[in-house]
């Protein structure tokens, strides 16, 4: 049975309005950048660590603790976020861990790489958890939350899909990992800025 035209209009309303929402775009861009950070790290960290002097087995193994602490961050951070009036500092601090992680891998000693990788794991997991919980925290209705989720995840993962490829291209272009690591550290800073903005109290109806 066909749905009445009025029902279809009401159902599509939140999805159309969401694209004109400043808050929705902040959440979407934050979602995209934090996804780039995660996928770049799991795609290229073993190669980076090997070039820094770590043996292949140890470099590959380093992803395991990173993903474990990432899972913990993605589970725990939304619990803290739900108890806060706004999440701007939680989000900025989580992304700052990625700045320290990538920056440390870029400029620090390989002996400190395990520490920086753990910080990166906590940061990437926490930012992911916050991005997901923003779908409900920045919405007044389930329809808005669904529309925001669709917008943020579709655009966010499209952005993320290009991240590892461009990171590898920068390596090929420059002939070293310093340039792409400097760029991804910069992307981490941008993620913190958008995360701070997306974490401020408000919803998708705000202008």
Per-region residue spans from a language model:
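Helix-to-loop junctions at the C-terminal end of transmembrane segments
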Residues: 73-86
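Paired small-residue
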Residues: 112-120
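Extracytoplasmic gate region of multi-pass secondary transporters
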Residues: 20-74
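A late C-terminal transmembrane helix in Major Facilitator Superfamily
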Residues: 139-184, 195
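Multi-pass alpha-helical transporter architecture, strongest
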Residues: 182-207
């Amino acid at each position: 049975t066909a749905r009445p035209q009025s029902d279809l209009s009401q159902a599509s309303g939140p999805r159309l309005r969401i694209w004109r929402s400043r808050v929705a775009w902040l959440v979407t861009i934050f979602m995209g950048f934090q996804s780039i950070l995660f996928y770049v790290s799991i795609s290229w960290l073993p190669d980076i660590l090997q070039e820094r002097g770590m043996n292949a087995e140890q470099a590959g193994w380093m992803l395991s603790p990173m993903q474990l602490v990432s899972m913990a961050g993605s589970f725990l951070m939304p619990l803290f976020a739900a108890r806060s009036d706004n999440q701007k500092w939680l989000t900025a601090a989580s992304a700052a861990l990625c700045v320290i992680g990538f920056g440390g891998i870029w400029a620090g000693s390989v002996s400190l790489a395990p520490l920086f990788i753990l910080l990166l794991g906590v940061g990437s997991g926490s930012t992911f958890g916050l991005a997901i919980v923003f779908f409900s925290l920045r919405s007044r209705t389930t329809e808005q939350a669904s529309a925001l989720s669709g917008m943020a995840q579709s655009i966010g993962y499209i952005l993320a899909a290009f991240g590892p490829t461009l990171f590898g291209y920068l390596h090929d272009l420059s002939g070293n990992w310093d340039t792409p690591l400097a760029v991804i550290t910069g992307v981490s800073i941008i993620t913190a800025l958008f995360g701070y903005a997306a974490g401020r109290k408000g919803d998708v109806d705000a202008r």
